[in-house]
Amino acid sequence: MMTAPNVVQSSPSLALSFLSDLTPPSLERTWLTAPHPTLPLVATCSSDKTVRVYSLVNFRLLSTISGGHKRSIRTCAWKPNVSGESVLATGSFDATVGIWRRWDDYGEEETLAQGNKNTKNFGAEEDREEDEDDEWRFAVLLDGHDSEVKSVSWSASGMLLATCSRDKSIWIWEDLEDGDNNFETVAVMQEHEGDVKCVAWHPAEECLASGSYDDTIRIWREDIDDWGQVACIKGHTGTVWGIDWEDAENVPFPSTSNGVSGQEEEWKTWHALSGPRLVSCSHDQSVRVWRRQPKAQLNTAGASSIPSIIRPSGTDETWEEDVVLPHAHELPIYAVAWSRRTGLLASVGADGRLVVYEERFVSSHTKPQAMNTDEVSPNLGEGVCAPHPSTEWSIVAVVNGAHGIYEINHVAWAKRADRGRDGNKEEEVLITTADDGSIKVWTLTR
């Protein structure tokens, strides 16, 4: 049986430092900041019915997108795997989803992402024309939800867009990429019993997760042309405000003790079987990590062998709670972000606190032990052990009152692109978004 991670409440060991505000900010509540997948850009959505696009090179406003929605813009997401232009989806309290396009004329995409000499032009908003806003084209309006749109998310391929709403539904749209900005409705799922707060696509597969006011997380997959629920994850005792997936290649930090070996390979083996984990945050003030049980496999040791575990066939999945992270918030937690580069987790919420967590291997590696059929992992035969290395989670950095007295609505990781970065390594920044309209950028150092 897989060894559950330990939870360690420790003194912060990393330093979170304020780097810059994104300026000028909105004068109204700002909900979310979405980093561009390749360029040093972020998009922020606001109650003033606009999306502001900022440079991460000099933290200045590049353009303001407006005119497409009649009420607050609650959410936005960049389409991945697009060449030559940027495509942004926006979700609004007016119950619609907008698709915006803009040709990438800041310079060569690759050189901009690397932050070399061309980045100077990218960050120099003073060189821009007054009609910058007109360069964003309102391509299409997706209409279908009956109430406020709360979250939008593109699949890893960029072909599918998921949207969710206060109307308790999740819609999946396919971008036909026919040159006419046509989208087709692929599925409408209505199993949630409350306002659906968030959706997030698996980092590699066409698998969708959602969180809701009904306190559950649900997993969705397509089976023979029909989308349906394959898991309903229960454990939170309050609204699930945010979810995020672990990177498919994530490996915990090494143990601080010497003499620990083999854990990384064992981890990768288990990771390949169960796939990326899912993290969630809730009104119940907890951050929880969930892991999918691997599908049952047949024991093929001999011709007469039979499965050691009899499980129903079909698409249903079993998800288990991997760990509850150390308690760090005193009020509802609104957002959580799992770094694709380092595996660090960050959370923010109504208490104005920014918290960073780290997972490490521990030296007290549980030795493999034979187990009975009631305890065996579903992917293993009778008496076979599950040598999963032990890990522990700890709080490594905390900032209280990160935006003064204001609630923090969102947190995101992004690649650092300003001139103060270390050019010899790939650094990250944290971006927090708050009720007062401010967006702050933070660095994390050991």
Swiss-Prot record:
Ranges for the WD repeats: 22-64, 68-110, 144-183, 191-230, 235-300, 328-367, 402-446
Keyword terms: Repeat, WD repeat
Gene Ontology terms: cellular component: cytosolic [4Fe-4S] assembly targeting complex
SUPFAM superfamilies from the UniProt entry: WD40 repeat-like (SSF50978)
Keyword match Hydrolase: no
One of the protein's GO biological processes: iron-sulfur cluster assembly
Entry keyword annotation includes Nucleotide-binding: no
Pfam families, per database record: WD40
Its job: Essential component of the cytosolic iron-sulfur (Fe/S) protein assembly machinery. Required for the maturation of extramitochondrial Fe/S proteins.
Membership in a protein family: Belongs to the WD repeat CIA1 family.
Entry protein name: Probable cytosolic iron-sulfur protein assembly protein 1
Organism, as annotated: Emericella nidulans (strain FGSC A4 / ATCC 38163 / CBS 112.46 / NRRL 194 / M139)
Lineage, opening ranks: Eukaryota, Fungi, Dikarya, Ascomycota, Pezizomycotina
Gene: cia1
